[in-house]
Amino acid sequence: MIRPKSMARWVILGLTGLMLAFGYAAAQQGERGQTSYLPVDITESFATIFARMTAAKPGIEQAHMAVLNERSDLSDRAAQGATMSRGKPLQEGVRVKLPAGMTWDRLAAMSPDQIRAQDLYPKGFYPLPHPNHPEGGMVFPHFEIDEIKKQEGRDLKRFDLDFDLPDQFLPEFPAPIYLTTRPDLGDVSQGKLVTITNYYELFNGLLNPKQLEGLRLLLTPFPQQQFNQTEDRRSEIPSRGVACFDCHQNGNTNGATHLVGDIRPQQFRHRIDTTSLRGVNIQRLFGSQRALKTVEDFSEFEQRGAYFDGDPVIATKKGVNILERGSQVHFMTEFQEILDFPPAPKLDVFGKLDPAKATQAEMRGQDVFFGKGQCATCHQPPFYTDNLMHNLQTERFFKPVMINNMMAIGDGSIKTFPLRGIKDTPPYLHDDRLLTLEDTVEFFNLILGTKLAPQEKQDLVAFMRAL
């Protein structure tokens, strides 16, 4: 027989267990969204949406800029004698800010557990949030917006948000275009941004008809999540949409940003950088984490899924463009697969430095790259990729934390991007968190525990600039 006091004790324990279970379930529920779908039936008028989001814009941008300035030094400090392929100066120096009183050497000497326990992981090494993470979507640099508006009369400006990173940290614009089929010509862009209005004039006689049609499709705008004709858009006037080369300008990148479409809920989605299409022909994985196996798959995926945040329901409302695999997708990918890396005159046919052309610093940097730095474990010559994905387990260094409405929990497996032409495609890492090559060296020195000396770091940067 259970005594009253014992019964009371069991009741209390039972209630406590229920409360703990409920708390755990609530915590689990907080990690899930209420739904995987975006709202389709918008009852708010566009005029009201426009007024509300325009009024909120200054506060949103101010909060995000505070995050950027806390993470990194955004000043314009060009490197002497180091430029991209068409002459834009490279930014130099480590821009990620250290915790007060810390040095890079002291930090590198600590274990991941120590850094995590003492909250010493540099803010600039955390995942970088979207300029407005709860809203997300494509955001373009102003120079892309201005040139497309000038040439096509199409406006890529969002009324609710502007691009966040300063121009000096972005790729040169317009980017040069190199073709694997005509290496004798060098840059075939004539210094122009290729658009639907000038592609025929620039490429008729250089491409075959399939490639020319593929380029036309890559330059043709189609409706997208933020740029469409419905009331649920982020352009002031109804938009014809976005073209592939609005982000991949001239087959390279302009640094435009977005959120991955394959994660829910919203706060767990990762910011993504626009990657270059140079060297598509030697790559076997596409998408930073999706691991699509062909560029044909990715071209279809962009139109059907990524343009609409991975939501085919809302895509139906806004105007999804279904590409025909046997012709349109083939044409688009045939052009993408002849986009070449920029010239690297100091490299030999094996992708390594020619000692007769390289500086001593570059040669020392190559030794670090293939030795102590462990870089070549993943980035293998001649194109400096292994066409695999790797998980750096960055979550070893920090506790999960909310950063301006983005939940930072780690990165997961990420594609090994080619390093050929790396100097032409800042900022770095899949989400733009690293502004310079020096930042990148410090990041991997910490994550991989390689404990490079200051001179070794400088030499490694010199080598990567030569790739």
What kind of feature is each model-predicted range?
Residues 1-8:
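N-terminal secretory signal peptides that target proteins for export/translocation
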Residues 7, 20, 24-26:
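Residue-level detector of intrinsically disordered, flexible termini
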Residues 12-22:
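Bacterial N-terminal signal peptides
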Residues 25-467:
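Periplasmic c-type cytochrome electron-transfer domains
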